[in-house]
Every structure is written in C-alpha cells, then in structure tokens.
C-alpha cells in the first residue's frame, strides 16, 4: 500500500529490483499506488479501481521522468541560515555555513536520512541546532509569535489534528485567508467530503485525512508553510488541486512554501526553487531537469 511514498529514487529502485526477484521466485505481489509509472519495468498486470469496479489496463503509459523544479531567479530572501549544525545522536546531520532560501515555492529533495524533515523541524524550532536562523532578517526564536508566521504540515495527518471530527477541526480556524472559504467549499465538493464531516477521522482513508489536513493548513494566514511529504496518499487529481491552491496563496497573499517530497511530478513547472541536501549540506540546484 503506497510502499514508496516516503522513499528516495535510489532506494526505491533497489527495493523494486528486490521485489521483482521475489516475484521471479514465485511470490505474488500486489501493490496499490497512485504512481503506476514507477512499475512499468516490473509489473506484469495493471488494474484501475474506480467506483467500486476493477478495470484491466492494457496499455499503461509512461510519464516523463524528468521534472523542472527551478523556474525563478528572484533574489528576495525569506530565510537565512548562518553556521547551522544539526546533530542526530552523535552524528552531524547538517552543516551549513551561510545559506539563503527565497520567497516563493521551494522544493527540498535528498536521499532518505539526509535531514530534510529535521531541517523543517529546526526552522520551526521543533529541533535543537547550533547557529542562527533568520526569518525576514529577524532571528527565529520559539514563541507564539513565530507560529503565527510559520506553520508546518506533518507527514502523519493524525498528529496534526486537535479534534477527531473534521467539522470541529475546521470550525476551530479563526484567522484564515479571505479566499480560503471558497477553496474549502471547492475541495469538500470535488472530493465528496461534504457529507463526511461529522464522521470520525478514523473512518477516513489516508487520502481523505491528508486533504482535510492540507485544507486547514492552506487556509491559515501564515507567511511560510513547511510541507513534509504533502502528496502522500493523494491521487493525481488531488495533487493538482492542492498545487493550484498553493499557487493561489502565493499569488494573492504572497505566501511562501518549502515542500519536502519524493513525489516530484506535482511540482513540475510549479516550483520556483530547488534545494538538495547532499554531503551534509544544502545546495541550490539550477538545472532545468531533475
């Protein structure tokens, strides 16, 4: 069930090769995923589930594996990292001398274990670090004031919710963007969630919970939203909807985003900047394709 949602490309390919080897030794493998193109060189059969019916796909198509994640050259910064060192146990995970992150939509990539989630937690003061982080030239400190400016979308939607009832969760929102109500109504209608708001989140699918989580976070008035694997459990239509909302927030409200994702297709030609974590530090990637 979406086995590679949080797995980097290199590791994913190694695991797929292992699965194929198991298959060659007589093990039947059934995979449920929103990215069928990952399995074109491995799977024998593709089926599509829609409205309670299974349909055999006779000609699964391949998508362009290359995505463009850097589409902007503006220089207005939102974050500056100065002499940052982050430890994971006794291991130094990140060491950054001086690095700027710009306003807009930034995609943050890197292999598993390189520190992507840890960096987001450091920015939001949920992880200890040495050094200084500046937000709009003001040193970041853990405070209530900070969380009115920076918010974080956690990987596990359940960890984000205060209430188990979606209607209650939505009603708790106070300071939201003027255009957010319209987008909330659109999301609930397009994904058939209008009649589900009084059901416990325990009865929601992973994708439905993720949509409610993102709906609440994208509605809130914050200058910077940190998104950790926001496309997990979402189908292509849902990913496109969320990216349209993100772009609308950027256009109408000037909101900025740092998005950690191993699923890059939704960000193709929509991401302004691409930052990669490798060799324990940060790098701006300016090539057209990734």
What is each residue range found by the language model?
Residues 179-196, 215:
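Conserved ABC ATPase "signature" region
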Residues 32-34, 260-262:
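H-loop/switch region of ABC-family ATPase nucleotide-binding domains
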Residues 1-2, 225-229:
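Catalytic Walker B motif of ABC-type/P-loop ATPase nucleotide-binding domains
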Residues 128-146:
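Conserved ABC transporter NBD signature motif
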Residues 8, 235:
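ABC-family nucleotide-binding domains
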Residues 200-204, 208:
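Conserved ABC ATPase signature
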Residues 124:
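Helix-to-loop junction immediately C-terminal to a conserved catalytic motif
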